[in-house]
């Protein structure tokens, strides 16, 4: 019912500066989620951490492009990128495109992705407690987003996110 798009560029110009991003998303129905985040390391001994987690349901699609770019002069810098995707529909489309660019020596860049589905063992666990497949999928989809909402440290933001999840799931 809508497409959401997130674009972001971060510039790490100061030595020993750090950046952390925790991204949560939920794609449902025919929604398209499009996220592009670029972290540019210029300063020495800078750090970046990109964490994305979410769920795709129904016929939704998602593309996540996370780029860590070590520019000339960014020696001794570290960049990490990690994504976890829960795919909860036969028609979902997931694209995870990590990119590490390096124009400097002595830097560390890591990326990884975990892509999973509701497996039979987990479904059996839920069903043995009277919870059907659709409700189990909603519980799992909601869990990653609620965790991020709690980590904001802002009660109003947390309440807003929970309200949206209550309406959507």
Model-derived regions, located:
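Detector for repetitive beta-architecture
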Residues: 9, 16-18, 36-38, 47-49, ...
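Feature marks extracellular polysaccharide-active and adherence modules
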Residues: 22, 40-42, 71
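A glycine- and small/hydrophobic-rich beta-loop-beta segment
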Residues: 26-27, 35-47, 52-56
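Amphipathic, heptad-repeat alpha-helical segments used for oligomerization and assembly
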Residues: 94-151
């Amino acid at each position: 019912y809508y497409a959401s798009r997130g674009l972001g560029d971060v510039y790490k110009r100061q030595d020993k500066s750090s950046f952390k991003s925790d991204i949560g998303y939920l794609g449902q129905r025919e929604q398209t989620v499009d996220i592009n985040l670029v972290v540019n390391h210029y300063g020495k001994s800078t750090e970046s951490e990109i964490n994305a987690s979410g769920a795709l349901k129904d016929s939704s699609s998602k593309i996540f492009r996370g780029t860590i770019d070590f520019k000339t002069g960014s020696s001794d810098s570290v960049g990490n990128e990690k994504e976890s995707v829960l795919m909860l529909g036969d028609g979902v489309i997931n694209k995870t495109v990590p990119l590490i660019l390096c124009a400097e020596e002595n830097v560390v860049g890591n990326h990884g992705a975990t892509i999973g589905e509701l497996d039979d063992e987990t479904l059996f666990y839920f069903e043995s407690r009277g919870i059907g497949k659709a409700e189990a999928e909603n519980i799992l989809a909601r869990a990653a987003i609620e965790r991020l909402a709690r980590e904001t440290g802002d009660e109003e933001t947390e309440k807003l996110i929970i309200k949206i999840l209550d309406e959507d799931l």
